[in-house]
């Protein structure tokens, strides 16, 4: 019986543990007086106003309770200080219960209910008394031992399993009691434990609801409901009648509470006997134990978790990995059991952290603490039913943290202890916050660094695997890289048929084997349509109507091409005019700018001229000096005569050269003058003189030639004296006429020259000194050179 009870409690504890992850289960430590063995009894989920019972035997000293109730913090010495902590929560969707037909576990654990509120712990010292059912559906502890509490668990030595007893809860508080009958010895032990805790409790601290004194053997206990649903159209199931479901857990860190009456709606009925003095003393004692309790929390968590998994493995044969994060347990339950644990698991994880652990010494005797339910909105978890990777860091959103902190602060008596209860969640959240902070710091560093396209694409590919670098290639570059062909080239393309208006990408068959429709024919060029018609006549016999239609189509195509060409020519003409107009506008603008500059310069020059004339008018002496510059040469006769003579001498006397006219070379020699060598003073003056000499020579030569020709004419008119030129016939008889004629001509030419010489120079005209050619000299001195 003990083995079956432990197995059922372990299986039910696992299912309830999935809804209460961080030590939110109820502690039921049933210690048997007879066998001196610590048995981990049943752990059952409860409603919003549920409670748990720790049955400890004082005779066994309960030395092993610290391992099972490690977070209860010295509950063995405070067994009588029973404080009930309740939260008004809502009923959640039940989890299907794991059944085991081999062990006889079945209908007694059909449904497991979880609550968003905290569970309760009750340390009740029990004995080996039996339980009997009352007429009103409740059970009573009797001394006869006719019935056993196993009737509620459907666990008996015979192996018969019955359905759990469903007891409806009425509004009458007297009907909501589950009474136990205890022995005087147990009551005395309870009184001794209360005195050891310095609570100064009188008999009223353990006074039952019927108002009897402390020696009464009856204890009242709230009944844990079992679900019953009533469905309405268009609404979710509503729980109306709670049922009893005793629960126990291998471990729990929950506070003990006195036995009180709780309504079905979750409201609280204050205990009948409340001793304020005892409450104050108890608070002082409890506050002293807070530090020790908080220090032991972290050490006990590992032992509790280990015990949970070992108990689970012994019961079901399977256990999740040793990790307390609610994501792992969530996925584990989803993989191994049917149902949806998200309603009971995730909400319980945070809401049940209030008033859960280390509250045994903080609460008053006979005081009921109620915490209002905190609304908790959990974010949507992506793929919650997939296996969760243990190595992946688990993150809790900040809104969960804020709701958990707000729910923690809702209980005024447990503010110092809830931080230790939420160590696992807060550490997970802190890790998540550290990751977020690290990511934000990395982002700030990346912003400060220069942008790298490769790193950005890699990061984007890691986020979006289907990302393609060429996907966002803008078509603007292709459009901007349009061809810069001239309009004449475009016109040639149109004429050649390369670019067609309305031409599809598919090539049109112009082989003539197939008769094309009107639409296809109109898409052809003039050359293509000519080829098409010629080939079509070769393969087909056309009627007159078809030929007329082809002619019309060909005419349309040509007209279209001509129109396009004319438009293109007109366009080109207009563009050329526009370019010329732009050029003329530019030239006009430049000319205007030059004209403006010239006007400005003219104005400036006029201003300078006006200023000079004004200065000359104002200064007459300056005007006279300025007028001498432009005055001509004086009108003196002497100066003009001397200048004329000098010019004449310079031209005809100083630079005169005798002509080489010699009528008789023996008698008359050319007149020669020996010119002195002139020193070159300046190159400019020498060049001027040289030019004047050349001109005078030409002039003198022209005069001499005219005289020479006139004299020759006069000589030719006078008769020749041929008496001296008779040919001796005796000596020259054998000569011919030709030779005689030549001689006559030669002798006649010599005679003419002699005659001319005689005529040109007569004895009368030539002076006595110059008769001889050898004595012909000039007695005049040489001219001095020009300065």
Swiss-Prot record:
A GO cellular component entry from the record: nucleus
PROSITE patterns noted in UniProt: BZIP
Sequence ranges of Low complexity compositional bias: 18-90, 186-223, 235-258, 273-305, 351-366, 473-483
SUPFAM superfamilies the UniProt entry points to: Leucine zipper domain (SSF57959)
Superkingdom: Eukaryota
InterPro entries: bZIP (IPR004827), bZIP_Maf (IPR004826), bZIP_sf (IPR046347)
Compositionally biased residues, Basic and acidic residues: 763-778
Region (Basic motif) residue spans: 551-603
Subcellular location: Nucleus
S-adenosyl-L-methionine keyword on record: no
Coiled-coil zones: none
Alphabetical list of Gene3D superfamilies matching this protein: 1.20.5.170
bZIP domain residues: 549-612
Region of interest: Disordered: 18-95, 153-173, 186-306, 343-372, 401-441, 473-507, 723-747, 763-787
Keywords: DNA-binding, Nucleus, Transcription, Transcription regulation
GO molecular function: cAMP response element binding; DNA-binding transcription factor activity, RNA polymerase II-specific
GO terms, biological process: regulation of transcription by RNA polymerase II
Stretch list, region Leucine-zipper: 605-612
PANTHER family xrefs: CYCLIC AMP RESPONSE ELEMENT-BINDING PROTEIN A
Family label: Belongs to the bZIP family.
Function: Probable transcriptional regulator.
Protein name (record): Probable basic-leucine zipper transcription factor J
Gene source species: Dictyostelium discoideum
Protein encoded by which gene: bzpJ
């Amino acid at each position: 019986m003990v083995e079956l009870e432990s197995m059922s409690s372990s299986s039910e504890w696992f299912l309830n543990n999935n809804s209460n992850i961080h030590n939110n289960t109820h502690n039921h430590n049933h210690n048997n007086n007879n066998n001196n063995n610590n048995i981990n009894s049943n752990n059952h989920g409860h409603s919003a106003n549920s409670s748990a019972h720790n049955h400890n035997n004082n005779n066994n000293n309960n030395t092993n309770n610290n391992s099972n109730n490690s977070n209860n913090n010295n509950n063995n010495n405070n067994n009588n200080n029973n404080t009930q902590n309740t939260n008004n929560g809502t009923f959640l969707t039940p989890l299907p219960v794991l059944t085991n037909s081999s062990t006889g576990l079945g209908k007694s654990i059909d449904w497991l209910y979880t609550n968003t509120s905290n569970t309760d712990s009750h340390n009740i010292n029990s004995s080996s008394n039996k339980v009997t059912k009352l007429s009103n559906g409740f059970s009573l502890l009797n001394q006869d031992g006719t019935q056993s509490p196993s009737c509620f668990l459907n666990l008996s030595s015979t192996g018969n399993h019955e359905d759990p007893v469903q007891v409806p809860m009425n509004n009458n508080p007297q009907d909501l009691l589950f009474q136990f009958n205890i022995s005087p010895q147990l009551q005395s032990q309870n009184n001794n434990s209360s005195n050891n805790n310095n609570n100064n409790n009188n008999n009223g601290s353990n006074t039952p609801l019927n108002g009897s004194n402390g020696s009464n053997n009856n204890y009242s206990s709230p009944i844990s409901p079992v679900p019953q649903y009533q469905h309405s159209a268009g609404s979710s199931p509503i729980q109306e009648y709670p049922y009893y479901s005793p629960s126990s857990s291998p471990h729990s860190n929950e506070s003990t509470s006195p036995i009180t009456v709780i309504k079905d709606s979750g409201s609280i009925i204050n205990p009948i006997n409340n001793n304020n003095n005892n409450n104050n003393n108890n608070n002082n004692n409890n506050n002293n134990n807070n530090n020790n309790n908080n220090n032991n929390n972290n050490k006990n968590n590992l032992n509790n978790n280990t015990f949970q998994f070992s108990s689970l493995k012994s019961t079901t044969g399977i256990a999740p990995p040793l990790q307390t994060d609610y994501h792992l347990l969530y996925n584990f339950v989803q993989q191994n059991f049917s149902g949806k644990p998200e309603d009971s698991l995730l909400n319980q994880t945070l809401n049940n952290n209030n008033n859960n652990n280390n509250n045994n010494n903080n609460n008053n005797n006979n005081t009921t603490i109620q915490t209002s339910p905190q609304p908790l909105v959990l974010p949507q978890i992506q793929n919650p039913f997939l296996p969760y990777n243990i190595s992946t860091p688990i993150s809790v959103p900040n809104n969960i943290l804020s709701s958990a902190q707000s729910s923690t602060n809702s209980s005024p008596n447990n503010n110092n202890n809830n931080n230790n209860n939420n160590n696992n969640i807060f550490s997970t959240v802190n890790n998540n916050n550290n990751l977020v902070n690290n990511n934000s710091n990395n982002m700030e560093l990346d912003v400060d660094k220069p942008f790298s396209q490769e790193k950005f694409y890699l990061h984007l590919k890691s986020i979006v695997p289907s990302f393609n670098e060429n996907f966002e290639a803008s078509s603007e570059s292709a459009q901007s890289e349009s061809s810069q062909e001239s309009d004449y080239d475009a016109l040639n393309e149109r004429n050649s048929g390369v670019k067609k208006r309305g031409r599809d990408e598919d090539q049109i068959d112009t082989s003539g084997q197939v008769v094309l429709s009107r639409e296809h024919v109109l898409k052809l060029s003039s050359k293509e349509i000519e080829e098409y018609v010629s080939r079509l006549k070769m393969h087909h016999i056309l009627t007159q109507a078809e030929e007329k239609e082809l002619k019309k189509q060909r005419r349309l195509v040509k007209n279209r091409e001509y129109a396009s060409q004319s438009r293109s020519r007109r366009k080109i003409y207009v563009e050329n005019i526009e370019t010329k107009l732009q050029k003329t506008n530019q030239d006009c603008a430049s000319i205007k700018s030059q004209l403006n500059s010239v006007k400005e310069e003219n104005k400036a020059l006029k201003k300078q001229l006006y200023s000079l004339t004004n200065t000359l008018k104002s200064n007459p002496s300056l005007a006279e000096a300025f007028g001498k510059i432009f005055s001509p040469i004086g009108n003196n006769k002497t100066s003009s005569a001397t200048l004329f003579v000098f010019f004449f001498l310079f031209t005809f006397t100083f630079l005169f050269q005798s002509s080489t006219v010699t009528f008789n070379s023996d008698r008359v020699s050319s007149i020669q003058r020996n010119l002195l060598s002139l020193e070159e003073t300046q190159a400019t003056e020498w060049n001027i003189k040289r030019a004047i000499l050349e001109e005078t020579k030409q002039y003198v030569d022209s005069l001499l030639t005219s005289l020479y020709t006139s004299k020759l004419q006069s000589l030719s008119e006078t008769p020749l004296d041929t008496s001296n030129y008779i040919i001796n016939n005796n000596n020259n008889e054998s000569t011919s006429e030709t030779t005689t004629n030549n001689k006559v001509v030669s002798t006649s030419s010599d005679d003419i020259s002699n005659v001319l010489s005689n005529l040109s120079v007569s004895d009368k005209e030539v002076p006595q000194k110059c008769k001889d050619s050898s004595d012909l000299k000039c007695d005049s001195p040489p001219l001095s050179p020009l300065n």
